[in-house]
A protein has these predicted regions:
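Single conserved hydrophobic/aromatic residue that forms the stacking wall/gate
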Residues: 1-7, 11, 259-270
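Hydrophobic HxD+1 residue recognition
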Residues: 187
Length: 270
C-alpha cells in the first residue's frame, strides 16, 4: 500500500443506532473509539480509528477501554482475513500499559489503531431515519456516494444504485465467510459496513470441524448468529437498512435489490 496523502478531518466519535440481537436500540455510537484520520492510498481511502481510547459521549455505562487479549485477537483475525483475500478492517498498532481494565477478570488494557475503508455503518442510516432526522438522510447518502461510490455521482438513480451495491457487497462478504468457516458472532446492524468489510471483531470463531450450528458467542443464547444462520442475518440486516432508506428510495427499488441478494451469494460460493 502506497500512501498518497493524508486528508484533513476533525477527530470525532460517531453516533449511530442499530438492531442488537434483533432488538432496536435507538442510540449507540463510538463508545470507546475515535476516528482521527483518513488517508488516500493506492488501494483507496482508509480511515484511521483508535479503539480503547477512553470514554466518549456514547460510552453509556462502559469505561471506554479495550483489553490486550481482544486487541491481539482482532489483529490476528484481520491479518488472517486479509491473507484469505476477504475484505476486512486491519490493525496497524497495538499499545498496552500497566493500567488494569476490569472485565470478568482483571486484564491488561490496550489501544488499537484500526484501518478500514470506511466506518459508515448500516446503523448510521438507521439513526437518522428512526430518530426524526430523516431530512439528513439525503445529505449523508450524497456524502457517502461522493466518497465511496463516485461512479454513481452524476446518475439520477444513484441512491438506488448505492443500496444495490451495499446488498451485493454484503452478500459476497458473507459468502466468503461461509467458505472459510468464519463465524462473526455479533452481526448487529451497527456492526455492518456499507462497503462489505469484516468489521468490529468480537467473540468471533472459526470452525475446527464442520458444525453448521456452531455458536461462537456465549451471549447468543438463541443461536441468532450461529454459523449456518449468517446468510439469513445478512438479508435481515439489509432489510433493516432498506427500512431506514425508505424515505428516500422507492419501495419497489428496495425490494428488487433484496430479491437479488441470493444471486451474488451463489456466485461467490461457486
Amino acid at each position: 500500500v502506497h500512501l498518497r496523502r493524508q486528508r484533513q478531518m476533525c477527530i470525532r466519535d460517531r453516533v449511530y443506532a442499530g438492531h442488537q440481537f434483533g432488538n432496536w436500540v435507538p442510540q449507540l455510537g463510538d463508545g470507546r473509539g475515535i476516528l482521527f484520520g483518513q488517508i488516500e492510498t493506492s488501494n483507496g481511502l482508509k480511515d484511521l480509528h483508535i479503539k480503547g481510547a477512553g470514554k466518549t459521549p456514547y460510552s453509556r455505562f462502559g469505561d471506554g477501554r479495550a483489553v490486550l487479549r481482544s486487541s491481539i485477537r482482532e489483529y490476528l483475525c484481520g491479518e488472517a482475513m486479509h491473507g484469505l483475500k476477504i475484505p476486512s478492517s486491519r490493525s496497524l498498532i497495538i499499545f498496552t500499559g500497566e493500567e488494569p481494565v476490569f472485565r470478568e477478570t482483571t486484564e491488561p488494557g490496550a489501544m488499537i489503531v484500526r484501518s478500514a475503508s470506511t466506518h459508515v455503518r448500516f446503523g448510521n442510516f438507521e439513526y437518522l431515519c428512526h430518530n426524526d432526522k430523516k431530512e439528513l438522510l439525503p445529505e449523508l447518502m450524497t456524502h457517502v456516494i461522493e466518497e465511496y461510490f463516485s461512479e454513481y455521482n452524476e446518475l439520477e438513480n444513484k441512491f438506488e444504485l448505492f443500496f444495490e451495491s451495499v446488498v451485493r457487497k454484503t452478500a459476497e462478504l458473507i459468502a466468503h465467510w461461509q467458505t472459510v468457516g468464519f463465524a462473526h458472532g455479533v452481526m448487529n446492524t451497527d456492526n455492518m459496513s456499507i462497503l462489505g468489510e469484516t468489521f468490529d471483531f468480537g467473540p468471533f470463531g472459526f470452525l475446527e470441524n464442520y458444525q453448521p450450528d456452531y455458536i461462537c458467542n456465549h451471549s447468543d443464547y438463541q443461536g441468532r448468529y450461529a454459523f449456518n444462520n449468517q446468510p439469513n442475518i445478512g438479508l435481515w440486516n439489509c432489510q433493516a437498512l432498506a427500512a431506514a432508506l425508505s424515505p428516500i428510495i422507492e419501495e419497489t427499488a428496495l425490494k428488487l435489490s433484496l430479491i437479488h441478494i441470493s444471486e451474488p451469494t451463489r456466485r461467490a460460493l461457486i
